[in-house]
Amino acid sequence: MNNCNENEALKTNSDGNNVMLIRRVLQQATDHYPRLSALGFTLQYANCHSCDNEQQGNAQLLRFYAEAYCRIGEYSKIRIEAGKPSQPTLLRWLWEAESTSTCRMMMLFNLGVCSHPRHDSSAMDGIQEVMSLLVAAWCEVEPNGELTEIKVHRVERTNPAAFDKRYAELRDAALQIASPVAFAR
């Protein structure tokens, strides 16, 4: 798990490079994690003051990422203390760089942080926990904001029969993010 304060600079690409950026980020994530999970969702701002000022909007997104890292890190520690494995993860983020009152986003992470086949009856239970952590993180940053339209994607190299189909679904969902696309990890 990365340190809560550790953030790489936000990176944005021009329209012509968005597809390459998305494919590169997805490929790196699937190469890095045999059991990749991704959550696609929409952040809704309560006040449009955040969306009018690009610098303030970026700062708010960075606060959201930091809050999400911290909450997922704490969740991981609790799992380990309970005797359940929780593998380290690097959160990768894709989002619409020019958003208004909403921002479509995707978070990619190691499914092993919230689920282990030998210790958990369902991977979806762990994913639900991560989703609730994201909702809580956004509410901390934007108190009356909402996190909506959550879509779960699981791409597991450990299941080769379904891998190509699931990867294509994830790629298609990521390509739906409006241009220009930005990313962070």
Language-model features and meaning:
Residues N53-Q56, M106-L108, D120:
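Surface-exposed beta-strand edges and their flanking turn/coil or helix-capping segments
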Residues M1-Y33, L111-R185:
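Catalytic "initiation/cleavage/transfer" segments centered on a nucleophilic residue
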Residues P88-S115:
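Histidine-centered divalent-metal-coordination microenvironment in nucleic-acid enzymes
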Residues L26-A97:
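Signature for HUH/AEP ssDNA processing cores
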Residues C51-D52, C103, A162-F163:
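Short, solvent-exposed polar/charged micro-motifs at secondary-structure junctions
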